[in-house]
Amino acid sequence: MGAQAPLRLPAAPPLAVCGYTSVLLLFAFCLPGSRASNQPAGGGGDCPGGRGKSNCSELNLRESDIRVCDESSCKYGGVCKEDGDGLKCACQFQCHTNYIPVCGSNGDTYQNECFLRRAACKHQKDITVVARGPCYSDNGSGSGEGEEEGSGAGAHRKHSKCGPCKYKAECDEDAENVGCVCNIDCSGYSFNPVCASDGSSYNNPCFVREASCIKQEQIDIRHLGHCTDTDDVSLLGKKDDGLQYRPDVKDAGDEREDVYIGSHMPCPENLNGYCIHGKCEFIYSTQKASCRCESGYTGQHCEKTDFSILYVVPSRQKLTHVLIAAIIGAVQIAIIVAIVMCITRKCPKNNRGRRQKQNLGHFTSDTSSRMV
């Protein structure tokens, strides 16, 4: 037998081949997951376990929040705490309100050291205490030597050797013992004893300034005359000598860290109960505690009853009540006066009629016959 020729199928028409190809391509594109396989990883496809692009963005935000709060990004006493679905760096500082000012390395004055640490945590910046007491502006015309520490307007001037000299002290770099030198001469002042905030008596106010300059600490005049046993040093705060410069106290209690400047401050905790019937306030200018007494009380500690309260002009809140009471009283008085006037006018007429009837009843028969 001879070799058989291979079986050949009849050639398909060209139109049929094109039709089959187009159907296969259309079927391939319509298969589920085909579009996802064509898109790059991480592209705008559906998130695993999610419901769309919105869930993708939320997931990314959550992951970014978790990555942000860690030991490297939440420092200076901050604690990572849950805030909704993410984590947040929280600065939990319970600061007291006592006025013990400190100067920060950023040039800002803070009410006390706790407020400084809270500001460092809030801004995540390294803020340290450069000096005890408020920051002072350098108003002198010095030579400009030395570095300016901090960016604030009231920054300390850091000298090359001495450090910050305060209370009118000058840096003497040529001296053997480099330090702050006080050139205050009190020889021309007369004897005028005063009591200072450190509990010591000085012959005149100039010696108080000299002692403050030498000790490089704030010493203020409390009152004229020598100190007595009743003087309490703890009642005093610290302020600048001569009140030529009032520092700006940074309070991190609100979002803007507004500057706390004012002539009155809340009294410290050791003065609780200082005012019996009133509010205790610490006056910055005099560095003394005072009482704002309630209505009806007077005295240094609001312990006395004010008997002249009826003659005191009422406050705005009570003025409306006083006016209403006055109007009601005036109306009542007017009604009473009207009633009294009506009664007094009717009474004489009634009396006259009664008298006439009584006179007619007294006539006898003889008098009546005579009249006839």
Swiss-Prot record:
Single GO term (MF): receptor ligand inhibitor activity
Topology Extracellular: residue spans: 37-322
Cytoplasmic side: 344-372
Positions annotated as glycosylated: 55, 139
Membrane topology: Single-pass type I membrane protein
GO cellular component labels: plasma membrane
Record protein name field: Tomoregulin-1
Organism: Mus musculus
Gene name of this polypeptide: Tmeff1
